[in-house]
Structure formats: C-alpha cells, structure tokens
Amino acid sequence: MSLLDHAVSSGVIDLDKHQPLLDDRVHLCERAGIDPDFMLLAMDESVPPEAVSYVQAYRKLGRNGINGCAITGSMKGLTPMFSRMIGSYMRNFVDANLCSLEVAISPGWRHRSVLMIPDFWLRAKSEHVQGQMLSLMMEREGKQTVVAVADIEACINNCGPVMRDLLECYMVVER
C-alpha cells in the first residue's frame, strides 16, 4: 500500500477536500520546509498530546491570548515532530513553515501564519541575536510561533525579562 493510499484509508487525507493540496504537494512542502511525505502523515506518538491539542486549537489560540508554543525538554527528533505538525497545518490550509532561527530572523519569513523554529534556543546567544529573537517574537504577536527551547529558565536568564513576558503568552509543552 502506498503512503497516499494509507493516508486516505486512515482518514488523514480526504481526497475531495485535499486534492488541490495533493496536486501541488511537492511545491507546497518545499515552501514549508518539509519533505512531501509529511503532508500524508498523521501526528503520532512523537508529538506530545499537548502539542497535538495546540495544533488542533489553532484557530482559537490568538483569541485566547496564546501566541505560540514552546517545546522544552529533549531536543532529539524535533525536526520530524515539527514536520508532522506542519503537515497537519497544511491539511487544514494554514500557511506554516519550518525554518532555522537564522532564517526566521531574516527578512521575509515573519508573515507566515505559523512559524516553527526547532533551534530557537539551544544555548546562549549573542546580544545581537537575542535582540533579533525578541523582535521576531514581538512582531509575531497574533500569529502562532512554535519554538524549541532546551531550557526556558536559561533562555530567560540569557535574554532577560522581556523574554519572560513574551513566553508567558506561550503554551509550554514538555517532551
């Protein structure tokens, strides 16, 4: 059974609803920064239940004062996990993108509805990069940003009280 056949039989893909996405799957996934197979894969046990709930509640989050999700704890296997989450967003016609912090802080990326950054804070950053991180998070208020933060307290200690205030509006998911 092909991956597409499995996605259809398991209910991940509804051909009536998703055919336009499937017709342009390679291009859309390339733009989103994920392998095209992830559009056909459900979120599985690699995605914590709280993160699944976060993705499913996407349309209500901004109204409830949640600006994003901070994934903490183990940083192992983040890219495939984030890719499955993006695949789910894409199946719901949400403009989502997976990119590195370096790309996220460059011009042109901040407009995406959902931005997922698996290397947001893995270790201390220079003051210049800290400023760009804070600017990115402030500019993205009202849009959803998913960041990987190896240690929230260390991130706050390194980046200061503004980062603490920004992260207070994020759902924290421990892996």
Predicted segment positions?
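A short, basic N-terminal segment
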Residues: 1-60
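Glycine-rich P-loop/Walker A and Walker A-like loops and their local beta1-loop-alpha1 context
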Residues: 45-88
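A generic local structural motif
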Residues: 56, 102-104, 132-135
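Post-Walker A helix-loop "phosphate-sensing" segment adjacent to the P-loop in P-loop NTPases
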Residues: 85-99
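Conserved P-loop NTPase "ATPase switch" module shared by AAA+ and STAND
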Residues: 95-129, 149-150
